[in-house]
UniProtKB/Swiss-Prot annotation:
Keyword DNA repair: no
InterPro entries: Metallo-B-lactamas, RibonucZ/Hydroxyglut_hydro, RNase_Z/BN
Residues annotated as binding Zn(2+) 2: D67, H68, D208, H266
Keywords, in A-Z order: Endonuclease, Hydrolase, Metal-binding, Nuclease, tRNA processing, Zinc
Keyword tRNA processing: yes
EC number: 3.1.26.11
Descriptive protein name: Ribonuclease Z
Enzyme superclass (EC): hydrolase
Function recorded in the entry: Zinc phosphodiesterase, which displays some tRNA 3'-processing endonuclease activity. Probably involved in tRNA maturation, by removing a 3'-trailer from precursor tRNA.
Species per Swiss-Prot/TrEMBL record: Chlamydia pneumoniae (Chlamydophila pneumoniae)
Gene label: rnz
Assembly notes: Homodimer.
Reaction equation(s) it catalyzes: Endonucleolytic cleavage of RNA, removing extra 3' nucleotides from tRNA precursor, generating 3' termini of tRNAs. A 3'-hydroxy group is left at the tRNA terminus and a 5'-phosphoryl group is left at the trailer molecule
Pfam (any one): Lactamase_B
């Protein structure tokens, strides 16, 4: 199993269908379990996906329309029931604090887990852990809505043959990293001569929105982009009036953002068959998948290497 993968727990929008639950998305990032927009029934979806809810340690709510948050309370209660020892970090728009509290304390139960709230009022870097950072930007929806980007830093990868040919080893390598150049054997060796930069992996989560610059910025050069595509082009008027996107619009955003992989989700219940979503989007952006519940999407290999 990939250490970095996106698992679809639900892909419907406001109304579930017989085959699609309200949206919920689990992103596994090495040892982290990041749960995005847990809609109604998310706890049960974990069972069908054969995934332990205890793997979750961060929960993100883009906005407080029901299909993006009604599963929050039950997930917190389940984690409480399972007596998880790790803290549960919750990220959400600060303007929705009262709704977060209602979901968290909507029933009688004795909370013993540590829930750490991160109400977000400012756009930009929310947290930077060194190994990865969380970024939030406001999208263009009917209510205060956040899109997310998870990014790891770029890393220096050395070329062993180049190091060996120049006699560079041991502590000298640390000097080279620090100073970007060293003098050895009567010549100057630059860091770029013996290494390349591997671009850090990244994923963008684009929830309910009209096409907007913030969505493009979040997905810019990302490895993967999970994006709402509630409607097909034939119902574009509905997308515009409800502040959503069509599959074609989502694909156009992906193309402009130069993401590697687009995954469409958040489908209106009016569509029983989703084949046309793929046809519409792939005509604009070839590397596209239509979200399927319980399916895992491993991260594509990052080809962005500066040698």
């Amino acid at each position: 199993m990939s250490s970095r993968e996106l698992i679809i727990l639900g892909c419907s929008s406001q109304q579930p269908t017989r085959t699609r639950n309200q949206g919920a998305y689990l992103f596994r990032w090495n040892g982290e379990g990041l749960l995005f927009d847990p809609g109604e029934g998310t706890q049960r979806q974990f069972i069908f996906a054969n995934i332990a809810p205890t793997t979750v340690n961060r929960i993100f709510v883009s906005h407080f329309h029901g299909d993006h948050c009604l599963g929050l309370g039950s997930m917190l209660m389940r984690l409480n029931l399972d007596k998880v020892s790790h803290p549960i970090h919750c990220y959400y728009p600060a303007s929705g604090k009262k709704y977060f509290d209602r979901l968290r304390y909507g029933t009688i139960y004795h909370e013993t887990i540590q829930v750490v709230e991160h109400p977000i009022s400012e756009e930009g870097i929310v947290e930077d852990f060194g190994s990865f950072r969380i970024e939030a930007q406001r999208l263009q929806h009917q209510v205060d809505t956040l899109g997310w980007r998870i990014t790891e830093p770029d890393t220096i990868k050395f070329l062993p043959k180049e190091l060996e040919s120049r006699g560079i080893r041991g502590l000298i390598i640390q000097d080279l990293i620090r100073d970007q150049e060293i003098s050895i054997g009567g010549s100057t060796v630059y860091l770029s001569d013996v290494s390349y930069v591997r671009k850090g992996d990244s994923i963008a989560i684009i929830a309910d929105t009209l096409p907007c610059q913030a969505a493009i910025d979040l997905a810019k050069n990302s490895c993967m982009m999970l994006c709402e595509s509630t409607y097909l082009e034939q119902h574009r008027h509905l997308a515009e009036s409800h502040f959503h996107m069509t599959a074609k619009q989502a694909a156009t955003l992906a193309k402009r953002a130069a993401t590697q992989k687009l995954i469409l989700t958040h489908f209106s219940a009016r569509y029983l068959n989703l084949d046309d979503f793929y046809k519409e989007a792939s005509a604009v952006f070839p590397n596209v998948s239509v979200a399927q519940e319980y399916r895992s999407y491993p991260f594509p290999k990052n080809p962005l290497l500066n040698k």
